[in-house]
Amino acid sequence: MTKPVSRYQPDINILETKEWLDSLAAVVHFVDIERAGFLITRLIEALYRTGYKGNLGLTTSYCNTLPASDDKALSDSGEVAEELSAYLRWNAAAMVLKAGKFAAELGGHISTYASISTMYEVGFDHFFKADNNIKSGDLAYFQGHSIPGIYARAFLEGRLDEEQLSNFRQEVDGRGLSSYPHPWLMPDFWQFPTVSMGIGPISAIYQARFLRYLHNRKLIDTTCRHVWAFCGDGEMDEPESLGALSIAAREKLDNLVFVVNCNMQRLDGPVRGNGKIVQELESIFRGAGWRVIKLLWNSAWDKLFALDAAGHLKQKLEFILDGDMQRFGSASVQDRRAMLFAGSSELEALGASISDKEVAALGFGGHDRQKIYAAFSEAVATQDRPTVVLAHTIKGYGLGKATEGMNIAHNQKKLSVSDLEHMRDRFSIPITDKQLENLDFIKPAADSKVAGYLQTRRQELGGSFPARRLNADQSLTTPDLNAFESILGGSEGRSISTTMAFVRILSLLLRDKNIKDRIVPIVPDESRTFGMEGLFRQIGIYSATGQDYDPVDKGQIMYYKESQQGQLLEEGINEAGAFCSWLAAATSYSNNNLPMIPFYIYYSMFGFQRIGDLAWAAGDARARGFLLGATAGRTTLAGEGLQHTDGHSHVFSSVIPNCVSYDPTYSYELAVIMQHGLERMYGNNEDVYYYITMMNENYEHPPMPQGAQEGIIKGMYKLKALGHGKRQAVLFGCGAILREVEVAAKLLQDDYNIATDVWSITSFTELKRNAEKCLHHNMHNISAKPKKSYIAAELDVYDCPVIAATDYIRTFAEQIRPHIKNPYHTLGTDGYGRSDTRAKLREYFGVDAKSIAYTTLYALYQQQIIGIETIEDAAARYKIAQDKEYTLYT
């Protein structure tokens, strides 16, 4: 078996090696580097054909990717830029320390910005283009724990004031700054939320892809825009951070730049103490098809590497573990010499060739403005593939021996006076002893070179950054309800599902001249399941490269048609990626000044349960769009079983404040909800998004009852009344189970002469929110006339029991219990799902018509309206087991 080859194994034939290298150099010199690459590729292929089992080409030497000769000259004064950096470093640290001094519980992070500061400043001074009236700007996902530095820059620009900085993490009184990037809390400042960890990287990938989608569809020109994602090396362990790398390479997203801040530390300790995180990440990104730029060493190393012709130092560096390299930044000159030059005569000779001063100057590339500028310049110039910059830094850089490079750096909230003095001296911060002790914020004089440099650099790049647009310049003209007349009239005797009703509504919208081009249908490889294959040919499936093959079904009407101008995003089996596409579209009104209307349809079980963190971030990001949870309901999907049947997605959606949730039964309800959602989000520019569940069960859909529209939107309306005389019970239902409720009402009328009213509850969640809002108002306006909630007003006329049945766990319907004065009984599908027919499953969970009728009789028995003999008769008539186990535990 062939052993893997190491770059640094002993060379048994130096002359032969030299001949090969000289030949390669000749090809580069006399032909070009592309030809050299072609030859190397052919050689590697030939080697593998011989049976070689090793792994070649995924990592390179542990040195900078770009040679010193490629360093591009900075166009600014390094001295002025460093002076500006001193102000930023001080104010960022003072902000956190001042908050901690006020209340230690506030927390905050100092060390991350200290490590990434220079990279940010090179970006702000030379690369990050702002959005303005002339050009659209770049988009940036900033490393969450580093944002005090972003606030510090905004302070110097005059966007934030001292009071706001002093109120870092103190937001309740209205003059504070959010802990991390949160558009919900600072809507004109932050573009994207980036915590929790991992949501920034995956969101950035799909954001860059969506920019390309908009460009290829000729909606806007995005050629000059870049998406920047700043991540931590520890953050890359999150599956979301690396899970979508391939799509970025596959679609040649050269508008995307990742910058991984490799300070080698996560929250508790080293990221890879026994390994090398940079090499690991290089192999992953390179294997996925990305351009990898390693930014490891500062300019002081250039001389050493030039002298190291035989590669002895490179070899030494490659075998120093990260756990040991973590000490290098704060190590003494003597310790550095021992780490780098001990072990061989060649290394000792190399060490002897440089002075102690030169050894002390050896640092990491992530703190070298020149090296950063070269790396970023190369990244934005790269074509046909995304780029990652792996930048070596020190966590807590410049914060003193107690913090710099230490395992406690992440949680360091306090610095001693001596640490602050060290920081002041290290970066030449213009601050007096008294200002230092008081943690005063500092600004350069308005007429100083520093202030002028700051303003000039941002003016040349279009203005302040980051900044978020609250609304697009133009709102969309959305259709009124009359446009859905064919849906409102019912299915005219045909049996269809609400999913099919949605497809019909979507088809109507795709013919609306005002919004048809703004619609973005998104499906995670389930179009045929949902009956949406007709869209393949109608609007095309988006593909960055078009369709270079002949699909096997091309002769069919609804063949799989891919196009560079395609409208449908067919995401494959990838719910997280599909949601990120939806999120990019749902925030396009802000990020692109172009409102887009995304409809993401998916198995409801694989929505909030699977990507809840991203759904929460969507609320934070003020997303606007539609999520369609198809095949919803624990009994409605039937045969798919435990992992597929959804009985709780509405419980998850209810905790997101600006997620508006509905569970309609009939097509007219769906049409009313979607029309109202379009009006709210795209006509009125409300920062909400909609979650609507739909089923795959086919049945007839009646026309919309007169006067039902308001109730559908508010969350409830009376569907029908059965029987004569006084109402003895009120029955609530929604989704698939509303039809069981209707049958139950008929059973009660026919078998026991009990009159009932049946109500369609389109949204328990909206009813609860309205009731709680009224309760809050009444508690805090005790002298004003009390407000009555919508549900209380609708139930005012009843003094009988209310029975609610849904295809979800009881918690869903229990939301409104505090706001109902009547005796209230809920039926639901608590417990794990299982496979069987719909009828058997509904009987098992007790949400079938007979169980609903029996529960109603039991409620009347509890009120002493009927006797026990009626209950016993119903149990026998409806075959209700008296010893039935509770489904939660079965």
Positions of the model-derived regions?
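N-terminal amphipathic, basic-rich helices that act as targeting or association modules
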Residues: 2-157, 423, 496-512, 516, ...
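Glycine- and acidic
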Residues: 6, 23-26, 73-81, 99-108, ...
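Thiamine diphosphate
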Residues: 2, 14, 23, 170-193, ...
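Non-catalytic terminal/interface segments that mediate subunit docking, oligomerization
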Residues: 66, 71-92, 113, 128-131, ...
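Residue-level marker for buried hydrophobic side chains located in beta-strands
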Residues: 229-230, 258, 522, 628, ...
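A structural-propensity feature for long, helix-poor, extended segments
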Residues: 229-232, 236, 613-634, 639
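Active-site metal-binding loops of divalent metal-dependent hydrolases
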Residues: 227, 232-235, 262, 393, ...
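Cofactor-binding active-site loop characterized by glycine-rich and histidine/acidic residues
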Residues: 73-102, 109-251, 274-275, 532-535, ...
